[in-house]
Amino acid sequence: MEGQWRIGLVGCSRGSAYGQLAHRHPRCEVAGICDSDAEALGRHQRDLGLADSRCFAAYEDLVASTPRLDAVIIGTPICFHAEQAVLALEAGIHVMSEVTASDTVDGCARIIEAVRRCGKTYMLAENTIYRPLFREWERLISEGKLGNIIYGEADYLHPIPGLLVNPKTGERYWRADRPPVHYCSHSIGPLLHLMRDRIVRAMAIGNRKTILPGAGVGAVDIQLAAFETARGAIIKMTRTQVAPRHSPIHYYSLQGTKGFVETDRRGAGFTADGQQGLVYIQGEMRQAEVLVWPELDASAPGWATLGGHGTCDYGTFVAFLHAIETGEKPWLDEVHAWDLTVPGLIAAESAQQGGKWLEVPPPPGADPPVAVSGRRAATQR
């Protein structure tokens, strides 16, 4: 493509992170923004220097604007993701959507169907996959240092009570009705990417609300989910949106048949200092060794941190840009968006049923199940 990619943003709060990256990227321009909040829209209009004609209160007007957008980045509440993604795809516009893909299984299916019908690129913006530390883990796995991965942990403990309920007015926000385990892609995303696997069964427990009892299911004190993968591995995930913790943490661990890796449990941030972790490789080490996992991509430009989360958002945006420029499928395509979203939806159902194990359906059109460890599981694509 000659010239610049015309990028539209919907949902200025989260979308502004990618807006800053698109604004600075030499091959992109922010060609339109949309938000139902007039104050937020005006603020980001000023930040990006956009004319009034490029700012919209209605998403349909952004999608229909001329000259036509090449791509749209969706940063709205999750309940709108599927509908807005499908609308853009049907208009011939590429889509990068914030996580998770949808709040329903049907929404995820509609995204897959729209991509196949319209032929445009869809990518889930699961930024944790682009944390540099996971490149180190991928190297160890590809070199066979850890053996076969048999177990993973992915805890996301992030108290955000003020984003569930307004502490002054008591108004409930949309996250108040999102079960903690619904928001699973930050946890299972990088592990499934490293394992090249998908989840076939899920269960979860946790329904008590003692910390923020007046809110919805999003204020459940804590939820624990267990997942079984197609290759027979087990993943454990713990999630809270209200339990007090400083600092919030993403904790990850992978156990293989020859060793393990894990991150810090103390809530290390996205800094140039990286974070301490552990590694053990059988036959090379007498015991687990402490080391520092990198958290910033040293090869990224100086403005790469404008999106936030270190250089993760930059890595996500560049991967999307590469996909629409080359026509290659991103790893985080519509099918893997299903794999990173639906297990959390099924786990939430399990929690409502007292922790019953439930099958996680394969994406529409996936290969038929095969036997793994004596159970039915979906074949790896």
Identify the residue ranges that each predicted region occupies.
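C-terminal helix-rich "cap/oligomerization" subdomain common to oxidoreductases
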Residues: 1, 61, 71-73, 319-381
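N-terminal Rossmann-like dinucleotide-binding module
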Residues: 1-50
